[in-house]
């Protein structure tokens, strides 16, 4: 039976914004003006950027007006994120100075088109006669103003051409209007030594950068060596290295020629770099390199990058394309990992057993073998492999986890099958994520007060849903699917569904009891996507089969509807996460008579690169300011939903000398989690359930937004001001002001939380009535 959603008043849908707009994540790009004459210089610049900063890969905007298709192809071969933009010469037709046929003048004009870009928050311009020799991290972390290196010869009030670090306030119509007005007035000087119009508008008002970020060739006259700390070497002057160079600058030009490489040599040089290699560059340059050379180690690196991004089949394909020697354990392990992630278990087992022969890869290989056996339901084999991993490395955390899972005796089912509901969820391990630990029980409370095995038959989402599992589910009254953001591609990958429930289509089709999807979330991070058609096919079948399909926020609803045909859109409805209405669901709940005078702080570190981008240092410094400000008013304590969350306390102490108590919530049972959050006065949390759980027990919240789902929830309760982006330029001040405002008006804010909660409870009650009809209760 399928129930059509009734006319229940729900919170307004979340705005249809991009993920980075919701999280406030800074969009960073490089930019340059390129023409055919300077193309050799630009190609060397691209190579130097990748080789000197192998972990950096932002969009590179190429401004041009005459590049040939073959030239564009050569550029694209070197960088995976090229954005081509034609300059608009009409902007400059009315300018009163400048020889339009002079390249240096045209370049000075056309680079002004950078200020007309609106897609980015920070743009770093580079000249085509530059090479990058050092780390650009400082430039990528800049957050304010327009930064440049002052001119070396012609006065510190002017900026030198080539390098600019431009922030959002300058990428505006208002600033462009100033540039155009100055250009039309003719009140500027334009020659090969300066930026002319820009210098006239700024009049010295720019952030000064160290000369090493735009180290001009002229400082090396007399064949001086390039200083070791030079980050960007700029070949100013008429004579460029690719045109034959200039006498007296031999050592500088030798540095440029380090990047005069063929595509094949460039790819090999990048793959040979140590340290962190950026996923996009590694895949872009490594794929043709592996195809040409068949190099096993390069194939392993590219495959590992694919796995990190959730592109498991791509990882299988590239490692399967090369011959892996029997004694090279690491590639066998990575291939085994990729194969198990697409549910090709027998092939994966063979690869992992080969990897287990090497002592340095054995523990990880055994842990993966234990995981596969557990997924297939073979606890004895899983325990055997996990024990082997521990014997190789007694400290190996993953092996210990699988030993614990495989050795745990499942609770005895007390009720009869016909009285039970089957429940697919992610059942968290001891010391696992506190929010995920609480979720399955809270979902069950949405169907009644008895959450025990008398009423419920547990189905772990990550174990293969085989014929035996299908038979057990069909013996129950119905199937509930819910307990977190199950729509995420990489937490426990499988090739059967490409989301967290490991269910083949044929077994999903075989379910003949009502299927109720309850408060599931679409959990892809900003910068993460579902690339597999397999997920869409499984999702469509699930929606078709479901009698009830409820998602926990309107943002998830929009994302899922976009993947479905129109006729299925109306089946997707709003069902708030039950943790947000815990006060209504927990039998005998009583609000605390007195609260502790504390503020609890939570930060999350899973997928830290997607959460923070280049801004972690900024985030930590701003949190330190907020902790000092709030701490002068109320005691601040850290709360860890998982072990990784404890990093915030370590980093604050090491970097800023702040010591905070750490509460290990991952060790708490469900009642203790709710009780702690109910007793505190305010929770500042980055995890989704560090917002939803305290809200559900009536505690005010401020969300540190690093994931779209935080903004989705705040939009649903019509309180976007209860969130602040981890990227906010003034995070510390904003957080302090809002926190103290909530603490000073605490009773009123708690009343507001209760009122917001009532809106979600009405939706939950209306859905519960529909669910009772579905279940014939």
Region spans (language model):
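Active-site anion-handling motifs in enzyme catalytic cores
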Residues: 233, 404-777
């Amino acid at each position: 039976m399928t129930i059509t959603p009734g006319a229940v008043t729900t919170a307004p849908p979340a705005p249809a914004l991009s993920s980075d707009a919701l999280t406030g994540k800074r969009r960073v790009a490089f930019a340059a003006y390129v023409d055919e004459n300077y193309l050799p210089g630009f190609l060397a610049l691209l190579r130097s950027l990748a080789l000197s900063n192998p972990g950096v890969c932002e969009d590179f905007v190429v401004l041009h007006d005459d590049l040939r298709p073959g030239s564009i192809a050569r550029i694209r071969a070197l960088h995976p994120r090229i954005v081509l933009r034609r300059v608009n010469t009409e902007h400059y037709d009315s300018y009163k100075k400048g020889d339009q046929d002079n390249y240096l003048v045209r370049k000075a004009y056309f680079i002004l088109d950078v200020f007309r870009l609106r897609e980015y928050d920070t743009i770093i311009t580079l000249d085509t006669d530059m090479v990058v020799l050092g780390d650009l991290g400082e430039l990528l972390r800049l957050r304010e103003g327009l930064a440049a290196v002052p001119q070396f010869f012609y006065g510190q009030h002017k900026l030198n051409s080539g390098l600019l670090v431009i922030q959002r306030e300058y990428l505006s119509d208002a600033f462009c209007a100033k540039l155009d007005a100055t250009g039309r007035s003719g009140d500027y000087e334009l020659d090969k030594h300066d930026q002319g119009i820009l210098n006239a508008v700024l009049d010295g008002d720019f952030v000064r950068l160290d000369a090493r970020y735009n180290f001009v060739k002229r400082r090396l006259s007399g064949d001086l060596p390039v200083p070791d700390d030079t980050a960007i070497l700029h070949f100013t002057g008429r004579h460029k290295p690719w045109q034959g160079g200039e006498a007296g600058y031999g050592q500088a030009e030798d540095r440029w020629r380090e990047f005069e490489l063929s595509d094949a040599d460039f790819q090999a040089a990048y793959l040979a770099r140590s340290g962190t290699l950026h996923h996009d560059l590694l895949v872009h340059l490594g794929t043709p390199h592996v195809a040409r050379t068949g190099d096993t180690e390069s194939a392993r690196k590219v495959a590992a990058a694919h796995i990190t991004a959730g592109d498991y089949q791509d990882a299988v394909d590239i490692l399967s394309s090369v011959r892996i020697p029997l004694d090279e354990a690491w590639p066998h392990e990575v291939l085994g990992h990729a194969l198990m992630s697409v549910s090709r278990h027998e092939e994966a087992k063979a690869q992992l057993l080969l990897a287990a022969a090497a002592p340095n890869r054995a523990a990880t290989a055994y842990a993966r073998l234990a995981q596969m056996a557990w997924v297939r339901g073979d606890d004895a084999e899983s325990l055997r492999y996990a024990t082997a991993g521990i014997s190789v490395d007694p400290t190996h955390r993953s092996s210990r986890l699988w030993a614990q899972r495989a050795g745990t005796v499942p609770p005895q089912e007390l009720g009869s099958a016909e009285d039970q509901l089957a429940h697919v969820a992610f059942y968290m391990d001891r010391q696992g994520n506190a929010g995920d630990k609480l979720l399955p029980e809270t979902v069950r409370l949405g169907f009644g007060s008895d959450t025990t095995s008398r009423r419920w038959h547990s189905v772990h989402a990550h174990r293969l849903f085989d014929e035996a599992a299908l038979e057990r589910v069909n013996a129950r009254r119905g199937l509930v699917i819910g307990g977190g953001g199950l729509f995420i591609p990489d937490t426990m990958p499988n090739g059967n569904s490409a989301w967290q429930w490991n269910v083949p289509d044929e077994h999903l089709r075989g379910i003949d009891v009502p299927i109720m999807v309850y408060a599931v979330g679409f959990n892809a991070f900003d910068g993460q996507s579902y690339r597999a058609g397999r997920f869409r096919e499984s999702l469509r079948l699930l929606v078709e089969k479901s009698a009830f399909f409820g998602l926990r926020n309107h943002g998830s609803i929009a994302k899922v509807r976009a993947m479905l045909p129109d006729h299925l859109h109306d089946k997707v409805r709003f069902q708030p996460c039950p943790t947000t209405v815990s006060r209504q669901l927990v039998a005998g709940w009583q609000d605390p008579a007195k609260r502790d005078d504390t503020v609890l702080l939570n930060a999350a570190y899973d997928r830290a690169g997607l959460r923070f981008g280049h801004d972690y240092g900024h985030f930590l410094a701003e949190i330190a300011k907020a902790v000092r400000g709030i701490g002068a008013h109320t005691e601040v304590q850290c709360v860890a939903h998982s072990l990784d969350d404890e990093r915030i306390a370590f980093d604050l102490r090491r970097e800023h000398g702040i010591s905070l108590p750490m509460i290990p919530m991952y060790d708490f049972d469900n009642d203790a989690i709710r009780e702690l959050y109910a007793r505190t006065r305010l929770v500042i949390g980055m995890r989704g359930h560090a917002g939803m759980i305290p809200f559900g027990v009536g505690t005010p919240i401020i969300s540190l937004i690093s994931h779209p789902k935080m903004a989705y929830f705040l939009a649903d309760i019509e309180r976007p001001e209860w969130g602040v982006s981890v990227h906010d330029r003034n995070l510390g001040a904003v957080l302090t002001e809002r926190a103290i405002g909530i603490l000073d008006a605490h009773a009123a804010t708690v009343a507001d939380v209760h009122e917001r909660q009532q809106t979600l409870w009405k939706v939950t009650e209306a859905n519960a009535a529909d669910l009772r009809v579905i279940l014939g209760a």
